[in-house]
């Protein structure tokens, strides 16, 4: 088993069979300004709080990988607070691994994977719940107590003339204006709280002429302006277009002041069709612009999917999605995390499943699989920061995506009468339709199988080259290595 750094005394381990390629454990960047801006947030974290928003699908809603990443950031850079929470019970869905939620009364809900619901606009958490009943409740119970601190608490709800009032209990303490400096705002309300927190109870109070209480989420942060706040804001089944439906998010985000946003979508964009939709690039660029309108200096990190199977067949659009995200990151001045190749690339999800790191659907990971992903996300941040410390003036750091024998570089768009593909090198704007090219599918000539070697303890490149009757330079070229440094578990292509 390969070990990663300690996570609160527990090693995150994984077998070499997962084919994890640590050459990709970086956030790729395309100019020095973005790298410097990224690194400066961590250099100043002891006096300027770093706020990260992580959007995605079901894995982010449950907080499996983000719990590991958050814990590592807090351990190294200090905790800026717990971050966002939502009452998933009222939305009839599963909760975070870090807390349970329950409700009393009747609640209706909307989620970002659905079409826009003008009657229930969506906020920063990607879900909204609403009740028309006085004395309805939203309850939260944390598995680990939020430690006593000078907390800033923000409740996001529709605070207008027809909203019910609210009683707020932290454990058994009723929050009040005098003791807790409770203030009302257009976004909801805020207050101070110093004690530890394990249970939160929101009780809807009657008010003359009130008609409903509409809840968007709550956030618990530390008052001190230091450390990392890591908000995990996923919605199961959400695709990239879901970001464009968060109509209340911009106003609420100005309260939380995000410095970085990780846009971790893709699976629900390509899974069922095995194709890149013609509108996807436009949706991604609009999502990027939506966050830059909130904070022009925000760091945006684009990611990829992992290897996927759907109904027993490989999802080959994963390659094109990886290349599309890399291309958009270059054009839009974003950072890029190539999880697809880091996680082993094509035809590896079956192995992840066999080793107990992916579920039987070969789409979702298991708990320990997501722990590995969260750990490698944190390590990718750290490796990028180390690169900056060693080479502060480096202009870019890119690692070409791997080529595979089943790689499909073009993206077929569904069309019953024409065989067309979208040229994903072209930028799709609101006014210019996507460029299409008529094609004749080429004959696929299978490439010979590549010989691979998994690095073991004590191995050096020269020893591996000698055993396989090749040279160090050829191995470095075949694997696009920048140095002769290798790590245990790394999979090397052995050239002839």
Language-model-derived ranges and their functions:
Residues 1-16, 493:
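Bacterial Sec-dependent N-terminal signal peptides
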Residues 11, 15-17, 84-151, 156-167, ...:
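Conserved catalytic region of serine esterases and O-acyltransferases that act on ester linkages
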Residues 14-54:
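Membrane/wall-proximal cationic-aromatic binding patches
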Residues 29-43, 243-255, 282-290, 319-323:
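Alpha-helical scaffolding within the catalytic cores
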Residues 61-169, 181-282, 317, 364:
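Conserved SGNH/GDSL esterase-like catalytic core that processes O-acyl groups on lipids
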Residues 246, 308-414:
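Catalytic His-Asp segment of secreted/periplasmic serine-dependent ester chemistry enzymes
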Residues 258-270, 278-294, 301-339:
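Conserved N-terminal glycine/acidic-rich loop preference
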Residues 423-424, 431-473, 477, 482-496:
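Primarily a LysM-type cell-wall glycan-binding module
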């Amino acid at each position: 088993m390969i070990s990663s750094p300690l996570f609160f005394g527990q090693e995150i381990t994984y077998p070499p069979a997962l084919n994890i390629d640590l050459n990709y454990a970086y956030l790729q960047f395309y100019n020095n300004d973005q790298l410097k801006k990224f690194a400066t947030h961590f250099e100043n974290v002891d006096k300027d709080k770093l706020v990260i928003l992580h959007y995605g699908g079901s894995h982010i809603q449950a907080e499996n990988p983000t719990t590991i990443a958050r814990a590592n950031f807090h351990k190294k850079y200090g905790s800026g607070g717990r971050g966002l929470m939502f009452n998933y019970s009222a939305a009839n869905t599963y909760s975070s691994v870090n807390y349970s939620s329950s409700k009393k009364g009747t609640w209706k809900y909307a989620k970002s994977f659905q079409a826009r619901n003008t009657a229930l606009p969506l906020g920063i958490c990607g879900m909204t719940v609403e009740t028309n009943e006085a004395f309805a409740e939203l309850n939260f119970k944390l598995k680990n107590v939020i430690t006593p601190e000078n907390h800033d608490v923000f409740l996001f709800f529709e605070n207008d003339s027809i909203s019910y009032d609210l009683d707020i209990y932290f454990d058994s303490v009723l929050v009040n204006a005098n003791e807790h400096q409770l203030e009302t705002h257009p976004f909801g309300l805020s207050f101070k709280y110093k004690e530890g927190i394990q249970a939160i109870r929101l009780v809807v109070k009657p008010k003359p002429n009130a008609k409903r209480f509409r809840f968007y989420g709550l956030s618990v942060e530390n008052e001190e302006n230091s450390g990392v706040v890591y908000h995990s804001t996923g919605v199961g089944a959400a695709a990239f277009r879901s970001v464009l439906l968060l109509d209340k998010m911009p106003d609420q985000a100005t309260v939380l002041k995000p410095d970085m946003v990780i846009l971790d979508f893709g699976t629900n964009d390509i899974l069922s069709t095995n194709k890149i939709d013609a509108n996807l690039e436009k949706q991604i660029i609009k999502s990027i612009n939506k966050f830059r309108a909130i904070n022009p200096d925000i760091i945006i990190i684009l990611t990829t999917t992992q290897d996927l199977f759907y109904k027993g067949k490989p999802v080959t659009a994963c390659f094109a999605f990886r290349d599309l995200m890399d291309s958009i990151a270059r054009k839009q001045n974003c950072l890029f995390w190539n999880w697809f190749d880091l996680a082993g690339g094509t035809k590896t999800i079956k192995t992840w499943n066999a080793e107990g790191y992916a579920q039987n659907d070969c789409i979702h990971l298991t708990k320990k699989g997501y722990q590995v992903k969260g750990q490698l996300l944190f390590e990718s941040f750290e490796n990028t920061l180390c690169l900056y410390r060693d080479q502060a003036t480096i202009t870019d750091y890119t690692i070409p995506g791997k080529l595979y024998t089943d790689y499909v570089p073009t993206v077929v768009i569904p069309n019953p009468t024409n065989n067309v593909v979208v040229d994903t090198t072209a930028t799709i704007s609101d006014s210019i339709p996507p460029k299409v090219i008529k094609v004749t599918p080429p004959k696929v000539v299978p490439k010979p199988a590549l010989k691979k070697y998994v690095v073991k303890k004590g191995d050096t490149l020269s020893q591996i080259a000698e055993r396989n009757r090749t040279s160090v330079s050829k191995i470095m070229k075949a694997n696009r290595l920048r140095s002769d440094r290798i790590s245990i578990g790394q999979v090397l292509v052995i050239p002839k």
